[in-house]
């Protein structure tokens, strides 16, 4: 036999023409070809082998060698319906992972729980790591969590760490589980190719709450008040319309998703992948809409005879949200079906019919009535007279270097530098005629931005002693800085007094947030390590330890130092499949007994400067 050089060339001497040659490579299917001069062999990926490699905290492992509870998921290649966010790809796919949509709004977030919640007061959201960059739990305006900012078509795999023994390597941020996302990359030697995938979908309400029609309600009122002294008033309050208020607020929604990918390799050194994505998700509740634009760039060159592997990842996102007020849904069920959507005499209310009461507060001759606070509000007016929208942008990027030391190839040095930067602004304007308003309307805005940086480095040593003993030892350091800023302003107006004042002074500011915001930051410094020992591919031992130093905890002079927390774990496992009594069994593919213990932490319920005394000015 022989091996190829760096360019894939090989030479075999003293081989008869036509003899069968077997060509193999790790992660590829073995090919059998006939010997001939200048023979060319193309190896295909062996998906079964590739799927056995699982990304864990700070490294990878073969699936059969896992000791903690780790689940790997590759997104379906076939269209399984509307997939707007990465969280849609997780729903119902992994045991112990529950994904619950929060209201079903377009582009809305979801609650993700891994084996339930772990805290009564702090966050129960899992830690999300994208290409080695841990995200924070604070979203941006328009995107409450980090998953909504990722184009699902750019995701190569999910790896979910579920139990304490697997999550302890993430220390004070691992108590709720960890979701590790790896994005797609180019392949070495691949010819340039352009691919497109897109979809257009239609959504509609399946059913509505059964309520009376206008005619049924009129008949009911006539019978209910027949012979009653209030019969005349009750009949006079009825309208002549037949309005289905639920039909008025819902619509058939059309959504579209388009993605273009360019991938290939410059020679055999620089694989690349560039992607463009556009999503337009229209909600079935009128006025709700979500748009997202994404750009992804991945470069992963291999240098120095594959001893240095570099992964450069950059993902940009721009989002647009338009929110519909959910109060319209409740009011659509309760509002009088005999009344029209719009009617004459309601000019102060945008022309929309409302139940009114005399205006004893405002003393404005031009505004003699206000909406009756004891009656339902016009659901169409709620939607049409409120403009609530958000604009967002985000960038997540990382530079990942993995160096296999020359002359000492069992040792690998790994460095990751990454960042997560984003911002957004939400504007909310309520028309003066809106039933949600009080006389002269309101307007406001809230914005925020974040800058999160991370630096992690670790060394990993692999060593096999004979065929029985395998050691894998890793030790590293990580530094993280989280910074964010928020501002907001809100204004609402009301008449100044009982008599109309002079022109230009008709309205008084009664509620004002003057726009003062805040800035906050915290640091996390960590040391971590892991040791795996495998004997005879049947018996496994894993130990991990992480020490986290957080600026959120007390460090003041004279106080007990509470900044550092320590998070160990230990696991022992026995692979029954490797024993003689199961080795040849074709029914059981894998069986392993595992005993594990681990300790994780939680710092999301602690304020950045909670140990300082607060003063109000």
Predicted regions and their residues:
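Short, small/polar-rich motifs associated with maturation and membrane association
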Residues: 1-303, 308-312, 317, 325, ...
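Extracellular/periplasmic, surface-exposed regions of secreted and cell-surface proteins
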Residues: 78, 125, 155, 226, ...
């Amino acid at each position: 036999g022989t091996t190829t050089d760096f360019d894939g060339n090989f030479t075999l001497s003293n081989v008869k023409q036509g003899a069968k040659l077997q060509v193999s490579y790790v992660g590829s299917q073995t090919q059998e070809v006939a010997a001939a001069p200048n023979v060319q062999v193309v190896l295909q990926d062996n998906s079964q082998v590739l799927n056995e490699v699982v990304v864990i905290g700070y490294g990878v492992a073969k699936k059969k060698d896992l000791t903690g509870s780790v689940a790997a998921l590759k997104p379906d290649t076939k269209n399984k319906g509307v997939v707007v966010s990465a969280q849609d790809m997780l729903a119902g796919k992994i045991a112990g992972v529950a994904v619950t949509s929060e209201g079903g709004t377009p582009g809305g977030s979801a609650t993700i729980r891994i084996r339930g919640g772990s805290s009564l007061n702090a966050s129960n959201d899992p830690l999300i790591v994208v290409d080695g960059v841990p995200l924070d739990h604070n979203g941006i305006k328009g995107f409450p969590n980090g998953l909504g900012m990722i184009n699902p078509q750019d995701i190569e795999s999910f790896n979910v760490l579920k139990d304490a023994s697997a999550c302890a390597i993430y220390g004070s941020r691992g108590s709720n589980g960890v979701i590790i996302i790896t994005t797609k990359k180019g392949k070495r030697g691949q010819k340039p190719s352009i691919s497109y995938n897109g979809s257009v979908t239609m959504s509609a309400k399946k059913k509505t709450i059964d309520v009376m029609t206008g005619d049924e309600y009129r008949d009911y009122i006539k019978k209910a008040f027949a012979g009653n002294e209030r019969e005349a008033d009750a009949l006079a309050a009825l309208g002549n319309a037949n309005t289905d208020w639920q039909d008025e607020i819902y619509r058939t929604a059309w959504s579209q998703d388009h993605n273009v990918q360019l991938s290939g390799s410059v020679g055999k050194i620089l694989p690349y992948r560039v992607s463009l994505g556009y999503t337009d998700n229209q909600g079935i509740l009128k006025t709700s809409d979500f748009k997202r634009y994404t750009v992804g760039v991945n470069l992963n060159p291999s240098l120095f005879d594959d001893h240095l592997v570099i992964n450069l990842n950059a993902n940009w996102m721009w989002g647009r949200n338009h929110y519909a007020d959910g109060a319209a849904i409740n009011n659509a069920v309760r509002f009088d079906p005999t009344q029209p959507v719009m009617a004459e005499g309601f000019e102060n209310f945008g022309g929309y019919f409302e139940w009114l009461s005399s205006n004893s507060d405002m003393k404005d001759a031009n505004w003699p009535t206000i909406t009756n606070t004891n009656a339902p509000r016009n659901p169409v007016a709620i939607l049409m007279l409120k403009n609530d929208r958000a604009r967002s942008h985000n960038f997540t990027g990382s530079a990942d270097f993995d160096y296999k030391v020359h002359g000492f190839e069992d040792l690998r040095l790994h460095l990751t530098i990454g960042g997560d930067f984003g911002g957004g602004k939400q504007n909310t304007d309520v028309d003066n005629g809106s039933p949600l308003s009080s006389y002269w309307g309101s307007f406001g805005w809230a914005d925020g931005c974040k800058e999160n940086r991370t630096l992690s480095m670790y060394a990993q040593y692999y060593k096999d002693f004979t065929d029985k003993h395998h050691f894998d030892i890793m030790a590293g350091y990580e530094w993280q800085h989280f910074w964010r800023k928020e501002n907001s302003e809100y204004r609402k107006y009301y008449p100044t007094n009982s008599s109309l004042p002079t022109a230009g002074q008709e309205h008084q500011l009664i509620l004002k947030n003057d726009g003062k915001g805040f800035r906050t930051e915290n640091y996390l410094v960590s040391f971590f390590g892991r040791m795996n020992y495998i004997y005879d591919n049947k018996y496994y031992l894993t130990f991990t330890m992480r020490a986290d130093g957080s600026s959120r905890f007390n460090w003041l002079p004279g106080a007990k130092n509470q900044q550092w927390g320590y998070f160990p774990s230990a696991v022992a496992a026995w692979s029954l499949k490797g024993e003689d009594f199961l080795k040849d069994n074709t029914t059981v593919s894998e069986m392993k007994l595992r005993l594990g213990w681990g300790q994780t932490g939680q710092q999301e319920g602690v304020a950045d400067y909670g140990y300082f005394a607060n003063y109000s000015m």
